[in-house]
Amino acid sequence: MAIPLLQYKPSSQNQRVPGYEVPNEDTPRIYRLEDAPSYSEIQELIWAAYRQIFSEHEILKFHRQINLESQLKNRTITVRDFIRGLAKSEAFQRLVVETNSNYRIVEISLKRILGRAPYNREEEIAWSIKIATDGFGGFVDALVDSEEYQINFGDNTVPYQRRRFKDRPFNLVTPRYGNYWRDKLENERYIAGDIKNFLDLAKSIEIKTVSYQPVSTANISIPDTTRNTVPRGIPVSVNPSASFPLR
């Protein structure tokens, strides 16, 4: 039996308060499926979804989910299902889930799927228990199927950072891995600038010695080049005057 989600009290955030700001360059552009009738517009919506979920401005071709893109272009799935598929993809699992703790996975997922930061530590603990009991896939389903997601984004809107006021965008303050994984990567490679690193590098080099097999000259058999047969035929003189007449 799955453990129910623990209760937590929401804290005050900008997205919970109605805003009256004048739209400017910081206002996020909202991508809706009903506003994308042409091929170029649906492509912009797809790339907006990639940027939101993967938090990268350049998406590698290797990370693209071609099957999901095709289904969305043919209107066989909604944007909400497309977001669900991106969050459950193998690329997201390898880039984000495997490189972070459950608490940081909760923070990243709330920012990229629900468009807001965690309310408090209690919410992070509650969702981390959800990951431990139902797995990351069950956690994604709980976010995408939540009432909060439905109210703010519905079925055909790409999630975005809600009511960003003065703060930097989430993709600039929340890289795909934290300090723990960064320090682990630093420990696994050599850092330039310290002479001790060169000494450690030299010690880590394994020199493969070549084993030579000693050879005794007494054991080398020299082939016999003497002739045992007598040459046959008419002998020819090597004197040119005997072979060629002189004029």
Curated annotation (Swiss-Prot):
Keyword Thylakoid belongs to the record: yes
One GO biological process term: photosynthesis
Pfam families: PBS_linker_poly
Protein biosynthesis is among the record's keywords: no
Assembly behavior: The phycobilisome is a hemidiscoidal structure that is composed of two distinct substructures: a core complex and a number of rods radiating from the core.
Purpose of the protein: Rod-core linker protein required for attachment of phycocyanin to allophycocyanin in cores of phycobilisomes.
Protein name: Phycobilisome rod-core linker polypeptide CpcG2
Native source species: Mastigocladus laminosus
Primary gene name: cpcG2
